[in-house]
Design a protein with these regions (language model features):
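Helix-centered, glycine/charged polyanion-binding patches within enzymatic domains
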Residues: 93-165
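Generic, well-ordered alpha-helical scaffold segments in large soluble proteins
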Residues: 50, 74-81, 107, 146-149, ...
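A short, flexible helix-boundary coil/loop motif
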Residues: 153, 157, 184-191
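Structured core elements
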Residues: 21, 46-48, 57, 90, ...
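Active-site lining segments that contact anionic ligands and/or coordinate catalytic metals
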Residues: 17, 42-44, 86, 109, ...
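Hydrophobic alpha-helical scaffolding
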Residues: 34, 61-64, 136, 140, ...
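Polybasic low-complexity intrinsically disordered regions
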Residues: 1-88, 93, 103
Length: 191
């Protein structure tokens, strides 16, 4: 009711607790800037992938966080689950934050492949053209393909359960199914 009153009587479409779905009130508006889908509805999901296309961590966020604040937490989760610091961390430009990159370097990560699209600094431009940096970005591009597979093969494009717990369960089942396929593929090669 508050949202309706603000829109109709107050002529204010910018309501902080905007409800976009009556059936799933926790649904959020997600703007990614894609030409084909400028606005999507749902929840933000962070996925971390290691070698052999195995997903090591995922998180379904209740409220969409700022991507640039997630890098250190992602590396900490990796260290906690796998017991070692990664040699290379790759993410898209939304994760760029000088303070986060510095903190990740202090943790012992050798190579951080997170592009800074807005920089004019020639040193940073040169780093972004190095072989290891480009390799990290190719890895990240492959991870985008993993997200597409999760959506198509395992139904992550639409959650069939209700509520935040249902969303966590649905995403978790999809990731478990995908990991089982990839683990089986790796074991078949080594058998």
């Amino acid at each position: 009711m508050k949202q309706t009153k603000a829109r109709v009587f107050g002529n204010d479409p910018h309501f902080t607790e905007k409800i976009v779905s009556i059936f799933e009130p926790q649904t959020e508006v997600i703007r990614k800037g894609k030409a084909s889908k400028p606005t999507e509805f749902g929840k933000m999901v962070k996925i971390q992938e290691a070698e052999n296309q195995i997903i090591t961590s995922y998180e379904v966020y209740e409220k969409k966080p700022n991507d640039s604040d997630l890098l250190v937490k992602a590396v900490e989760e990796h260290c906690e689950r796998l017991g070692q610091i990664p040699d290379l961390v790759a993410a898209d430009a939304a994760f760029h934050s000088p303070s986060q990159k510095a903190a990740v370097q202090e943790m012992g990560v050798k190579h951080i492949s997170v592009p800074n699209r807005s920089t004019k600094n020639p040193v940073i431009r040169r780093i972004q053209k190095t072989r290891w940096f480009r390799k990290g970005q190719k890895w990240r591009t492959g991870c985008e393909g993993r997200i597409s597979v999760l959506k198509r093969r395992h139904g992550l494009d639409r959650c069939r359960y209700r509520g935040q717990d249902g969303m966590n369960r649905w995403v978790g089942f999809g990731i478990i199914a995908d990991n089982l396929i990839n683990i089986g593929r790796v074991l078949a090669v080594h058998a």
